[in-house]
Amino acid sequence: MWRTAVIIGVTSALWAAGKQGLSIGSIMLPRLGCLQLALVAASIYITTGGYYTLWLAYKTLPRDLVGGIRFVKVQLTLKWALYRNTTVPKLFMKNVRKNPNKVALIFEGQTWTFAQMDEYSNRVGNFMVEQGYKHGDTVALFMHNRPEYVCIWLGCAKVGVVPALINFNLRQLPLIHSIKVADSKAIICGEDLQDATDAIREEVNLPVYVSGCGTAAPSLEGAKNLDSLLCASNPTPPPQIDSVSAKDKLIYIYTSGTTGMPKAAIIKHYRYLFFCTGVHYMIALGEDEVIYNPLPLYHSAGGMVGMGQVLIYNNTAVIRRKFSASQYWVESKKYGCTVAQYVGEICRYLLNTPEKPEDTQHKVRVMFGNGVRAQIWNQFTSRFNMPCIAEFYGATESISNIMNIEGKPGSCGFVSVLFRHAFPAYLIKIDEETGEPIRNKNGTCVLCKPGEAGEFVGIIKRNHPMRDFHGYADRNATEKKIARDILKKGDTAFRSGDILIMDELGYMYFKDRTGDTFRWRGENVSSTEVEGVVSKVAGNKDAVVYGVEVPGAEGRAGMAAIVDPEDELDLHSFTLSLKDVLPSYACPLFLRILKDIDVTGTFKLKKLTLQKEGFNPSLIEDKLYFFDSKLQRYVVLTAELFNKIDQGQAGL
């Protein structure tokens, strides 16, 4: 009897949700009919016998149903694509036939139609075959953002050649590593990156093709002019398109390198489709969107999630060579953008720009990406009149991806608390000393309760379009990301390396990277949370926080590095504000004032080098300060004071 009630209730609710849909403009959840909601709630109560579960159903079921419907759409789309052996080029060519003259890309005033992209990519594909590159060969693509960049990797994909999308900011050793780890057979570089390519020629002796020279000869000795060669190439579709499978490698995309050398993540055709489809359906995008995408196209956010809306879903994208905070809203208004992307610290950079009319004169109704700090969320939506921020959590290679479809401030997504195993991703407890999972007497992992911090992991299911982990080009790196015996003996999971917290309604909140949480005064300190506070108190300046070892003291003391090239920081007011919002153990013991800071290509601040340098004024030229607990203020960290701290005489 109760099973019948469940079926009737859920079916009724799904019918109501499907009928009423979702308001795309505001990303509001549908209002379920009272009867349908009552049936669902009663069904759950019968099966569980708890008032608490009824309350959870009341609070979360509308969200879960909308998310569930969309999730099913994503799954069906992916399974159908696998069944049809659909590849990214095939889906793109379908859009070409449908709308050949529709604008696909806008770049610095230029427009590229779908037909133009198709012809250029056909030339690339045929050229690669003519040059002897075979299915499965890798070619390093080292270029700045421009339409040709997308067309080149798309053309390679048409014939099964795998482009490795290299970060255009890399030089010397990291660049050499990125090219070699993917086993590249050749390099395609931009005209303006010839010097960087020339600097590594002794270590990387590969054929080089230069894009962007026009009719001029490349300045790089021995390199070939790709533009001229493509002009002579066949513009018709290469016959090898049909020999490429949905399970073949499409591209390599590299991790950001915030904690070491970039890792080359394997992206297969259906994996690319998963990323694009997930965002497309979860935030209810249409086919006539104009997407502002100022992100680097070598990264998953810009090159997969953003560009995939063009290649797979027939939308238009506005791209630019490099991100500009001052031009973000100006160009969004100019090109009539309806959707915009962000990543990392971009939203804070936008808040730091002077107010101007374009801040609210745009047509953008939803922004999606990851990296908005909870401390600036409401300020951002208010200033820029933004109906919804669709923050998502995930990584290029991750299988535990979630999304905030309601615009709930601070949240990076949700999982259902009523149907917990519908999406097999969990928070597991981690040993703070070793970083390894804590296990119960059965040898399986201990799951976190609401409010407890843990590492987010996703259960791996081989050959599943959404849950298979394809790993990296480096097999050792792949093995390090896999945990075993999570829920039961023999299962495996992808380790995100990120610490999240889930509230009782299933909303997830990013807390920290594993290893970024440090312990001081017997308390755990989240560097990410303190960074958000320090940055806001300092006037939204770039800031990183990390733990440093202090001789004679247990744990690590907090140290904040703040970018303040104009020497604008008022230490007195900064200290007072910091003490008002942070507990004493979380307040940084040391300050370092920087002229600038290294940033990854995806606008994440690097701090590993800063952490290694510590707080020795004899080794650091930047201004250093120490918080004097007796004076209750920051004082200049002199060599004499450093010696006292080093000898355990500073009263810590």
Task: Specify the residue positions occupied by each region the protein language model found.
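Structural core segment of the AMP-binding/adenylate-forming
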Residues: 1-67, 130-131, 154, 158-231, ...
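AMP-binding/adenylate-forming catalytic core of the ANL superfamily
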Residues: 170, 177, 187-189, 340, ...
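Conserved pre-ATP/AMP-binding loop-to-beta segment of ANL
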Residues: 100-101, 145, 213-215, 221, ...
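AMP-binding/adenylate-forming catalytic domain of the ANL superfamily
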Residues: 582-604, 622-647
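Conserved AMP-binding/adenylation subdomain of ANL enzymes
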Residues: 273-290, 298-338, 349, 353
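Gly/Ser/Thr-rich phosphate-binding loop
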Residues: 312, 329, 333-343, 351-434, ...
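Conserved AMP-binding/adenylate-forming core of the ANL superfamily
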Residues: 14, 80-89, 93, 101-154, ...
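Conserved AMP-binding A3 loop
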Residues: 113-115, 250-274
